[in-house]
From Swiss-Prot:
Family: Belongs to the actin family. ARP6 subfamily.
UniProt protein name: Actin-like protein C08B11.6
Gene Ontology molecular function, alphabetical: nucleosome binding
Matches recorded under InterPro entries: Actin, ATPase_NBD
Key words of the record: Cytoplasm, Cytoskeleton
UniProt-listed Pfam families: Actin
Localization annotation: Cytoplasm, Cytoskeleton
GO annotations of cellular component type: cytoplasm; cytoskeleton; Swr1 complex
Domain of life where this protein originates: Eukaryota
Organism: Caenorhabditis elegans
Gene3D superfamilies cross-referenced by the UniProt entry: 3.30.420.40, Actin, Chain A, domain 4
Length: 418
């Protein structure tokens, strides 16, 4: 019997889900929402599209700081999502990105839910970064890769060799899209209009107006110009969810009806994304994303570092800001030895869905270690841990590596790992 294969990237903001033969994944909110104007209904997952008035939404999210902390809520969201798909779990298998799977100390009942509650036939668990690194290795024939994943809950940087994670190279920054939206809400509420409850609207405002400055000091000088001479300043007209359903960006010089709620964004447009490069701006004592890339590379054996620097792949929704890739490349270049080459890949068409598409190509072209129901019943977590540790390599194991082909021969069960 041929099984339907589902690829499921379980993100903190949006889930990316689709069958292996889909052209692109569906983006489904990974949250439950209560709207102020709807007294008797909650909107679960894709039902949020049916919510006509998105002012003052209250969110319940199963994922906090990048990990699932409320499995009951997550199960409810998954049930609604799977129910909207034209597939039967009993004749399907699912590849799931699951960050809890990477941390043995955290509760992870995803396999139990997928097997026992939904009844999937086979399950494969991995991470979004691993999908991208494996794709780079097996499909693009790149031996080394640095994956920068700037998502909703965090930004992580990890180095890989032959598709295997170098464990010491993982760097986490506690800044993602959620923190940036919350900070923009704070700044606008303090300076202009109280938008503390308008998470949905301000998140869209951030997406529509913010960009990464290539020179922060010069951008600040420009932002100090007088109101009418300031080319950075833009007006964002708030949606009313009757005639307009997304905010509209206008130049401040254009005439505007003062009765229509609007906000002005000037320095905020580039100061918000700047937090990704300088978290200390909001008192987070961590390095920025460029320094994290350098630190990740430096945690790897010296013989691998030039190849790592030549294949940096950027994914995640928070990397979609205009100028992000160029700024990252410029800052990393300034910190790398002059003899190293550098390539921050520009082949990523959509950073938000790139890991899903990598999984799609990998599952089509490669063997992966699926766990079936029988194996799960017999071995459970021990089987998952075994598969997980086969995808890791310690830096000490790579010391003395002279070329990648030698290391490739030493990689355990490479053709079976994902």
């Amino acid at each position: 019997m041929s099984l339907t294969t589902i690829i499921f990237d379980n993100g903190g903001h949006n889930m990316k889900i689709g069958t292996i033969d889909s052209e692109s994944p569906r983006l489904v909110p990974n949250s439950i929402v209560k709207a102020k104007h709807e007294k008797k209904r909650v909107f679960v997952a894709h039902e949020q599209e049916e919510c006509s008035d998105k002012f003052s939404l209250f969110y319940v999210r199963p994922i906090e700081r990048g990990y699932v902390v409320n499995w009951d809520t997550q199960q409810q969201i998954w049930e609604k999502t799977f129910g909207s798909m034209d597939v039967e779990a009993s004749t399907s298998r699912i590849a799931l990105t699951d960050n809890n799977y990477l941390i043995p100390a955290l509760p992870d009942v995803s396999s139990e839910i997928l097997f026992d509650y939904f009844g999937f036939t086979e399950v494969h668990k991995t991470s979004a970064s691993t999908l991208v690194a494996k794709h780079s290795n097996k499909i693009n024939n790149e031996k080394c890769a640095v994956v920068v994943d700037s998502g909703f809950s965090w930004t992580t940087v990890a180095s890989f060799v032959n598709g295997m994670l170098i464990q010491d190279s993982v760097i986490r920054i506690d800044v993602g899209g959620k923190a940036l939206t919350n900070k923009l809400k704070d700044w606008v509420s303090y300076r202009q209009l109280n938008v503390s409850e308008e998470t949905y609207v301000i998140n869209e405002c951030k997406e529509d107006l913010c960009f990464v400055s290539q020179n922060f000091d010069e951008s600040m000088k420009e932002a100090r110009n007088r109101f009418q001479e300031n080319t950075t300043m833009k007006r964002y007209i708030m949606p009313d969810f009757h005639s307009t359903f997304r905010g509209v960006v206008k130049d401040v010089k254009e005439p505007h009806d003062p009765q229509i709620p609007s906000i002005h964004l000037g320095v905020e447009r580039f100061a918000i994304p700047e937090i990704l490069f300088n978290p200390s701006d909001i008192d987070i004592d961590q390095c920025g994303v460029a320094e994290a890339v350098i630190e990740s590379i430096c945690q790897c054996p010296e013989a691998l570092r030039p190849a790592l620097a030549e294949n940096i792949i950027v994914i995640g929704g928070s990397s979609c800001f205009p100028g992000f890739r160029e700024r990252l490349e410029r800052e990393v270049r300034s910190m790398l030895p002059a003899e190293y080459g550098l390539n921050v890949s520009n082949d990523v068409i959509n950073p938000q869905t790139h890991s899903w598409h990598c999984g799609q190509e990998l599952l089509t072209a490669s063997k992966v270690p699926w766990i079936n129901r029988k194996d799960w019943d017999e071995r459970g977590d021990s089987l998952e841990f075994s598969n997980f540790f086969q995808t890791l390599v310690q830096s000490d194991e790579l010391k003395g590596t002279r070329n990648f082909d030698d290391q490739r021969e030493k990689s355990p069960k490479e053709d079976e790992d994902f």
